[in-house]
């Protein structure tokens, strides 16, 4: 076998930016490996900030920025970060990104920033963020790491937004602050807002219903007893 033939055989086709493997990094967290309903991470935010859709959307976009940015930075630095201080480096990177998010919210969305309160700062300790940095970004190239961050952020986001839609609609009769039930005249017919939907336990129950529906549809997610 000639040297040229051997070199040709050793060459592998270049993987596309959105190859099947890379697409799975986006699609899997939306369902089969959802960070909230399957891995049971980030539950605190689902309980605390899903009273209104606006808060859920802003928190979701904040996590998207932090996770994608953190994954990218850690992946770029993965070969130069000493193993013994990797957690510290990850925390510094995430903290810097969270500070940026917090300042932007204070400048452009002060009302939402006040409502979210300390929960934006607590993104630093979000298990989804630290888990993806440690489990994926440290061992993979920048592009897959960015896709992983995007996929897990979207998996986190759709759960928060769905929970917020149910809680705000049935608890306040609004969606994203716009009155929905009042123009329909339902209050005149005797309908009353369900104030229980505003309470944190209802967020947990709503997440539980989503988990039940998800596992009823996808039986492979059911844990073996």
At which residue positions do the language-model features occur?
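Transmembrane alpha-helix boundary signature
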Residues: 100-115
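Short, membrane-exposed interhelical loops at transmembrane-helix boundaries
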Residues: 176-196
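Intrinsically disordered, low-complexity non-transmembrane regions of multi-pass membrane transporters
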Residues: 1-27, 218-225
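Structural signature of hydrophobic alpha-helical transmembrane segments
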Residues: 53-69, 89, 113-124
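Hydrophobic core segments of alpha-helical transmembrane domains in multi-pass membrane transport
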Residues: 42-47, 63-64, 68, 95-102, ...
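C-terminal ends of transmembrane helices
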Residues: 70-83, 130-140, 215
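The first (N-terminal) embedded transmembrane alpha-helix
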Residues: 30-49, 60-64
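Cytoplasmic-side transmembrane-helix entry/capping segments in multi-pass membrane proteins
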Residues: 81-94, 115-121, 148
């Amino acid at each position: 076998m000639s040297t040229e033939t051997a070199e040709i055989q050793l060459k592998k086709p270049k993987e596309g930016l959105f190859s099947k493997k890379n697409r799975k990094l986006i699609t899997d967290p939306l369902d089969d490996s959802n960070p909230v309903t399957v891995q049971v991470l980030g539950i605190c935010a689902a309980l605390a900030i899903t009273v209104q859709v606006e808060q859920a959307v802003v928190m979701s976009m904040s996590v998207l920025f932090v996770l994608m940015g953190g994954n990218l930075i850690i992946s770029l630095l993965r070969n130069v970060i000493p193993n013994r201080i990797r957690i510290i480096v990850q925390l510094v990177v995430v903290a810097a990104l969270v500070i940026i998010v917090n300042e932007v919210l204070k400048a452009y969305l002060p009302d939402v920033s006040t409502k979210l309160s300390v929960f934006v700062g607590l993104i630093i300790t979000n298990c989804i963020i630290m888990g993806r940095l440690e489990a994926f970004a440290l061992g993979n190239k920048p592009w897959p790491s960015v896709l992983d961050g995007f996929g897990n952020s979207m998996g986190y986001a759709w759960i928060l937004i769905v929970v917020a839609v149910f809680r705000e609609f049935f608890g306040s009769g609004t969606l994203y602050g716009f009155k929905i039930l009042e123009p329909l005249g339902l209050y005149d017919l005797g309908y009353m807002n369900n104030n229980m939907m505003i309470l944190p336990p209802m967020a947990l129950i709503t997440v539980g219903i989503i988990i039940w529906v998800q596992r009823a549809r996808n039986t492979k997610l059911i844990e073996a007893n």
